[in-house]
Amino acid sequence: MFNKVSASLCDLIGKDYVNAVLDARAALGEDISEASAAANEVIDFFPESAQNKDNDMLSIVGKQIVKPFVNSVDGAGTGSFQKALHKNSAPVTGIGSYRIGEDGKVYLIGKSEHYHTPMGHRFSGYKLIDNARKVGIVNATHNNTRGYITRLCEQELIKAVNKGNIASDKSLSSVINLETGSLAVEAGIKMMLTRFYRLDSSFDAPVYSGRIPVFFVMADSIGGKTANYHGTTVVAQTFRGMWPELYESIESNELYKVVSIKINDIEDFKSKMKRYNTGKYKTAGFLHEIILMNYGGIRLTPEFLRSAYELCEQYDTPELVDEIQSCMWYKGMFLFKLYGLKPDFVVVGKGFPGGEYPASKILISQRMDSLNQFGALVTNGQEELASLSYLITMRFMEENGEYVESLANDFHNKLTSVGKNYPALVSKVEGEGHLVCVHFYNL
């Protein structure tokens, strides 16, 4: 069983702020009796009854338990989105680790909910979001008026990510709230580029002005670039081999270069680091996931990454760890901390807001904080209730990291055993903990 976590809104974000909201509503002439009750209601984040129900429902996965919701609404998606649509399994509702599809069947959510529901559907802890609305906390803010909850969330993230570290200019010290992982990664790429190009005419000449920035990414099995996935912005897509003619023009005009590194091959990393830090070239950054979930769940080893980071420090090359998919699935909330890594950028999202809001963020070291405000911002990036969802998820995980780790290890070990029982079908099981992929010889 998970450790019991219970809190009211006042417990989670502080009585002083909640009272300020209530006082403001009273000053507007509103009755605050219901709001006051909501502010002090203690919510059990994951009751024992909910945990038991989650376990019991496993036996009915795949079964139809209610009549299908038959409808002719197919949406108006683009050709590719419509081709990929399986509306029969789209959720009518969900609870815990399951959803009920439009076909009336019970589905185990798994990868279908794409990493962003580690707490499952309708997690009780998120009732505090409903209570925040009852209290009168508004969601919409602006970059120049980031609300109290968002500022508190930023501070709690920095505290959590630096826990146990010695302060330095490599310490993660600031946060940009950017809604989507694609924009969060792009912000990191922009900050890497500010060492080569001016963001605008008000900036001084960059430290590596005149040299060609070289970005390191992970290679696929044949040495190409398709294994790395860092979102859908144009620049990030050129990093993985998309827009080939555009990238060819970029490289031939020496604007930047993308170099792929063989998976877990430190000698390849070392030779390319030396090669691209001579003459006209300079390494601009090393971008990586830890579990390549868009490429067979291949895991980068701690030994490879630690050695790669040592080389990055030697050659003044910032590191960006993309934890959009892996965050919140491991003890301590960040997988890179379990590896003992100290990156300049950490991109998080999906798991932190638990599927309640799009709320990705990039955490930045002091030495790489180089953009002006309009260098990377999103109008809706600092929504207050989205930040509250972060704080709720973080509170639960802070109390349950050890148990989550034990579940992850048990799951991985048992899945590996299943693979060994079918050696003619399964070539290997890749990944770590909850993020795993089964490799078959053929499909």
Show the residue positions of the predicted features.
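N-terminal glycine-rich, Lys/His-bearing helix-loop that initiates the first secondary-structure elements
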Residues: 1-172, 268
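Active-site core of PLP-dependent enzymes with the aminotransferase class I/II
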Residues: 271, 291-315, 375
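Conserved PLP phosphate-binding loop immediately N-terminal to the Schiff-base lysine helix
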Residues: 289-301, 317-339
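Active-site PLP attachment segment
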Residues: 340-371, 382-389
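PLP-dependent aspartate aminotransferase-fold enzymes
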Residues: 1-23, 116-130, 156-288, 302-303
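Structural signature of PLP-dependent enzymes
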Residues: 393-416, 428
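Conserved PLP-binding catalytic core of the aspartate aminotransferase-like
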Residues: 408-412, 422-443
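Active-site nucleophile and cofactor-binding loops and adjacent substrate-binding regions
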Residues: 141-151, 174-185, 325, 348-353, ...
